[in-house]
Amino acid sequence: MNGELIWVLSLLAVAIVLFATGRVRMDAVALFVIVAFALSGTLTVPEVFSGFSDPNVVLIAALFIIGDGLVRTGVATVMGTWLVKVAGNSEIKMLVLLMLTVAGLGAFMSSTGVVAIFIPVVLSVAMRMQTSPSRLMMPLSFAGLISGMMTLVATPPNLVVNSELLREGYHGFSFFSVTPIGLVVLVLGILYMLVMRFMLKGDTQTPQREGWTRRTFRDLIREYRLTGRARRLAIRPGSPMIGQRLDDLKLRERYGANVIGVERWRRFRRVIVNVNGVSEFRARDVLLIDMSAADVDLRQFCSEQLLEPMVLRGEYFSDQALDVGMAEISLIPESELIGKSVREIGFRTRYGLNVVGLKRNGVALEGSLADEPLLLGDIILVVGNWKLIGMLAKQGRDFVALNLPEEVSEASPAHSQAPHAIFCLVLMVALMLTDEIPNPVAAIIACLLMGKFRCIDAESAYKSIHWPSIILIVGMMPFAVALQKTGGVALAVKGLMDIGGGYGPHMMLGCLFVLSAVIGLFISNTATAVLMAPIALAAAKTMGVSPYPFAMVVAMAASAAFMTPVSSPVNTLVLGPGNYSFSDFVKLGVPFTIIVMAVCVVMIPMLFPF
């Protein structure tokens, strides 16, 4: 063992210890590695910074942007809402659908992001079903990890291994090369969790969050006595409202009808359009109306204006919470609007929002509020577009936002662009499948289109990239080059050959899986893939077999981080909400990791012959 190899292995040991202790940020450790290699002269400057020019680093950054675009447009949130409706109160159905949904979404966006989105969904469902969240949180994390086995772009380790294949002059994996293995693991994972979830006792009730919690739409509806006031009315052809401006119709004065928004068909889908005083109505528009006057004859109103009552699900537009927001505001002492009524202020025209409730001295006022003077200390309930509510809250000149309901966390800043986001995702996958356009270029095209369609803006795009992950990959890549230059890879391959080389390639697959899984207990799965990929390819070359089975087993083992709560950020996320201990992950993670290893040893040679 030469001096340079001892230096590289020592540096690797230091990095692993720092990763394992968690006292130093992982990206800081990666930068330390870059500096150490550059100053020691072990690698040339181009070799040290080769990670920054790696196409897969660009691809990973682009995938962060695409994933955030799916979040901002509400695609993931809508999936969560659908999941709750379909599963009902069945724990088995919820577990199966949860794992299928998370694995499906995680195949195209960050598994950590998907799991973060579904944690509040799972907590809500657990509370409603009066079951322990621990029975669903572990399946959630397992599904997030399994999603990394569903497509080539699902997780950075897959791309790292693919990059090593390309660097060695081989063809890379196709987009769905890993999918058959992932599907089998997913099915086994669902069956495994259906049986083993009973080992996760947890608390019988969902742990309550400490301190102040936000109220919900339902709380505000009850406090301001809004029950029974909401209506959905469709404008029939020939209605006198067609082509008329809202202010000219005087609906509030004549019928006590306050138009909150309009459902309108736009590009083959129904969207909710915000309204103001100059908004004009069209045939077949569906009006979302707050009827503040209890004595108004709804039948007469519909007859005179040729309106057709429509079904309204949920209480007071709660089913439209992704588009229609609600907030409590109050006048500030310096406001010039104190003493003026809603009508005098021109509230809807000025702010694009509707005043539907007013509390004075803790008591909600009833009836029409349009001519009620607003006093200092009044709490005003406004309804309208979430974006406009946010603008009013930030304005700070006349009003201060007192309370935004819990549903604000589900609102998506670009909800109306969800079809465009899905189109961009499908286009990216299609371009990757053609093999005519490089994967990073296909991802960048999708990012540009998301920007064009306003699924995401430039500032949000840069913020969505998880730069510590990018720096970690870039900083660990020089290790692969250094181990090859100094003979470290050859030494590792010799050790593997001594252990399992005489028993054939199947045994070597098992050895590579075990080694990758063990290393993954101490460092991130991405760093594991960076270190193990060159060793796997060198082992294949030594044995005279195809490199693809060995490369694939490293990618799969890197995603099989089921054994400890620190093996992956996905596990760490559910640790608290699930009220788990370290032993919970060990007793469920170790057996399932062995199952995944068995699947890989059997299936990989079938898909990628030696």
Curated annotation (Swiss-Prot):
GO terms for molecular function: monoatomic cation transmembrane transporter activity. Residues 218-307, 314-398 form the RCK C-terminal domain. GO terms for biological process: potassium ion transport. PROSITE patterns: NA_SULFATE, RCK_C. Keywords: Cell inner membrane, Cell membrane, Membrane, Repeat, Transmembrane, Transmembrane helix, Transport. GO terms for cellular component: plasma membrane. The chain crosses the membrane at residues 1-21, 29-49, 51-71, 78-98, 102-122, 136-156, 175-195, 373-393, 425-445, 464-484, 503-523, 543-563, 588-608. It is a multi-pass membrane protein. It is found in: Cell inner membrane. It holds the Pfam family CitMHS. Its main location: membrane. It comes from the Bacteria. Belongs to the CitM (TC 2.A.11) transporter family. PANTHER family: BASIC AMINO ACID ANTIPORTER YFCC-RELATED (PTHR43652), RESPONSE REGULATOR (PTHR43652:SF1). This is Uncharacterized transporter YfbS. It comes from Escherichia coli (strain K12). The lineage of its organism: Bacteria, Pseudomonadati, Pseudomonadota, Gammaproteobacteria, Enterobacterales.
